[in-house]
Design a protein with these regions (language model features):
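Metzincin-family zinc-dependent endopeptidase catalytic domain
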Residues: 16-128
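N-terminal leader/targeting segments
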Residues: 6, 32-36, 137
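The catalytic-center signature of Zn2+-dependent metalloproteases
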Residues: 102-166
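Alpha-helix initiation/capping motif
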Residues: 15, 96-97, 142, 161
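Generic structural signal for residues positioned in beta-strands
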Residues: 5, 55, 92-94, 130-136, ...
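Short beta-strand segments enriched in small/hydrophobic residues
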Residues: 1-14
Length: 166
């Protein structure tokens, strides 16, 4: 029985009125992938550490990118709600509080984080949007729970350790 650690790292001094619903959303959506299995997840806020299976950095917006401190030349779609960048054996993921369209609803972070996790946990693939079952893997992330194919890919991704940008 594996317990996969998902660390949420706040880079914007978020209030508990923001962090609690984000954590609840991430826990619920990721937890759906492990229903009926002997594995589970543990979601917590704090600094990332090498033992974490997935580290998600929360920043104000693209201009406040944490990933660009490590990879200054990476490109991000200007309308993205999050971004994952991998180089060599290292993957980093960040989620944005605001986009040009406005603030992202807190309840949507579970689906957004799940989508970005598929990029993070499969750093050598570039076909996540088309080959991982649609749904939350799609380029335009629906306001929905993960489908069975999404869940299967997430479990597969967690089964192999990907080095995380801390």
């Amino acid at each position: 029985m594996a317990i996969y650690s998902i660390k949420l790292v706040d880079h914007r001094n978020s209030t508990s009125a923001e962090t609690a619903p984000i954590s609840a959303s991430v826990t619920r959506i990721f937890g759906l992938a492990f229903v009926g299995t002997s594995d589970s997840i543990r979601v917590s806020w704090g600094a990332g550490n090498p033992g974490d299976d997935l580290v998600l950095h929360f920043v104000a917006d693209i201009a406040s990118s944490y990933l660009r401190q490590r990879w200054p030349n990476m490109t991000v779609s200007p309308n993205a709600g999050g971004h994952t960048h991998s180089h060599g054996s290292l993957s980093g993921t960040e989620l944005y509080r605001t986009t040009p369209a406005g603030a992202i609803p807190l309840r949507r972070y579970g689906a957004l984080a799940f989508h970005e996790a598929l990029h993070n946990l499969f750093p050598f693939r570039s076909d996540q949007h088309t080959a991982m079952g649609g749904g939350l893997a799609s380029a335009n992330i629906p306001d929905a729970d993960p489908n069975d194919a999404n869940k299967s890919f997430l479990r597969q991704g967690f089964s192999v350790r990907t080095h995380q940008l801390l």
